[in-house]
């Protein structure tokens, strides 16, 4: 699959699928795939961020994120294509898996 910016209808379809397969909460905000995760405490939030960081580094695809205590707010976009790509949805799915494991 070619890495490219997704068209609006492709984004909507992938977003619907993501929110069906994963927990609800993913949305498009400021042309980025966004969600805020809430964890039991800071330790669990940081554990989640660590798993995501290690995976993202291997994929060479890094999230924009912000952490306060037990909350992690995430925005995903593909800077190299100036928009949302399949890489963002793939990373979002992996983040859902990591969130369930902490």
Swiss-Prot record:
Q: Which InterPro entries does this one have?
A: PCD_sf, Pterin_deHydtase
Reaction(s) this enzyme catalyzes, per UniProt: (4aS,6R)-4a-hydroxy-L-erythro-5,6,7,8-tetrahydrobiopterin = (6R)-L-erythro-6,7-dihydrobiopterin + H2O
Keywords (alphabetical) are: Lyase
Is Manganese among this UniProt entry's keywords?
Answer: no
One MF term in the entry's GO annotations: 4-alpha-hydroxytetrahydrobiopterin dehydratase activity
Instruction: From the UniProt record, give one GO term of the biological process aspect.
Output: tetrahydrobiopterin biosynthetic process
The family database entries (PANTHER family) matched by this protein are listed as: PTERIN-4-ALPHA-CARBINOLAMINE DEHYDRATASE
What is the protein name stated in its UniProt record? Putative pterin-4-alpha-carbinolamine dehydratase
Natural source organism: Marinomonas sp. (strain MWYL1)
- Supply the source organism's classification: Bacteria, Pseudomonadati, Pseudomonadota, Gammaproteobacteria, Oceanospirillales
């Amino acid at each position: 699959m070619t890495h490219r910016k997704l068209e609006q209808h492709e984004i909507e379809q992938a977003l619907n699928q993501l929110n069906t397969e994963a927990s609800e909460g993913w949305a498009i905000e400021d042309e980025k795939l966004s969600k805020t995760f809430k964890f039991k405490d800071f330790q669990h939030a940081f554990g989640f961020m660590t798993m995501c960081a290690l995976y993202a580094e291997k994929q060479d695809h890094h999230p924009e994120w912000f952490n306060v205590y037990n909350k992690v707010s995430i925005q995903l976009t593909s800077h190299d294509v100036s928009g949302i790509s399949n890489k963002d949805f793939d990373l979002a799915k992996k983040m859902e898996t990591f969130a369930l494991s902490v």
